[in-house]
């Protein structure tokens, strides 16, 4: 299945709580590549930060992933790694979780994107 999808396009990966991952998996996002590595990681309160960081770095290195979706509360735990990622691909998008609403003030990627545009250029 992963080989077929890789031919058609790139993948979206998900790092988050069980509810977030299950939702995206039910939506058809889940894949396992030829090396038997999934494109998602379920994080719970017992997941070590080092494991979360390693997974994020693995997703960054995979050439079949173009977008990484990560729960914002997970992103907070590895903020230094996310901030070090400056390449546009894979794009990293912070999303809310069931228990933690999205807070735009914590999203460093959004702050970077806002800095790229002059607000006066957007008004016509």
From Swiss-Prot:
<dbReference type="GO" id="GO:0046961">
    <property type="term" value="F:proton-transporting ATPase activity, rotational mechanism"/>
</dbReference>
<comment type="function">
    <text>Subunit of the V1 complex of vacuolar(H+)-ATPase (V-ATPase), a multisubunit enzyme composed of a peripheral complex (V1) that hydrolyzes ATP and a membrane integral complex (V0) that translocates protons. V-ATPase is responsible for acidifying and maintaining the pH of intracellular compartments and in some cell types, is targeted to the plasma membrane, where it is responsible for acidifying the extracellular environment.</text>
</comment>
<dbReference type="Pfam" id="PF01990">
    <property type="entry name" value="ATP-synt_F"/>
</dbReference>
<keyword id="KW-0813">Transport</keyword>
<keyword id="KW-0375">Hydrogen ion transport</keyword>
<keyword id="KW-0406">Ion transport</keyword>
<comment type="subunit">
    <text>V-ATPase is a heteromultimeric enzyme made up of two complexes: the ATP-hydrolytic V1 complex and the proton translocation V0 complex. The V1 complex consists of three catalytic AB heterodimers that form a heterohexamer, three peripheral stalks each consisting of EG heterodimers, one central rotor including subunits D and F, and the regulatory subunits C and H. The proton translocation complex V0 consists of the proton transport subunit a, a ring of proteolipid subunits c9c'', rotary subunit d, subunits e and f, and the accessory subunits VhaAC45 and ATP6AP2.</text>
</comment>
<dbReference type="InterPro" id="IPR036906">
    <property type="entry name" value="ATPase_V1_fsu_sf"/>
</dbReference>
<dbReference type="GO" id="GO:0033180">
    <property type="term" value="C:proton-transporting V-type ATPase, V1 domain"/>
</dbReference>
<dbReference type="InterPro" id="IPR008218">
    <property type="entry name" value="ATPase_V1-cplx_f_g_su"/>
</dbReference>
<protein>
    <recommendedName>
        <fullName>V-type proton ATPase subunit F 1</fullName>
    </recommendedName>
</protein>
<comment type="similarity">
    <text>Belongs to the V-ATPase F subunit family.</text>
</comment>
<dbReference type="InterPro" id="IPR005772">
    <property type="entry name" value="ATPase_V1-cplx_fsu_euk"/>
</dbReference>
């Amino acid at each position: 299945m992963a080989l077929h999808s890789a031919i058609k396009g790139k993948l979206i990966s998900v790092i988050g709580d069980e509810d977030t991952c299950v939702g995206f998996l039910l939506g058809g996002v889940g894949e396992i590549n030829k090396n038997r590595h999934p494109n998602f990681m379920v994080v719970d309160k017992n997941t070590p930060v080092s494991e979360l960081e390693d997974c994020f770095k693995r997703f960054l290195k995979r050439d079949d992933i173009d977008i990484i979706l990560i729960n914002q509360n997970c992103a907070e735990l590895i903020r230094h790694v996310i901030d070090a990622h400056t390449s546009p691909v894979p794009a990293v998008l912070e999303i809310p979780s069931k228990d933690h609403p999205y807070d735009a003030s914590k999203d460093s990627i959004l702050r970077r994107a806002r800095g790229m545009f002059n607000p006066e250029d957007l008004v016509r």
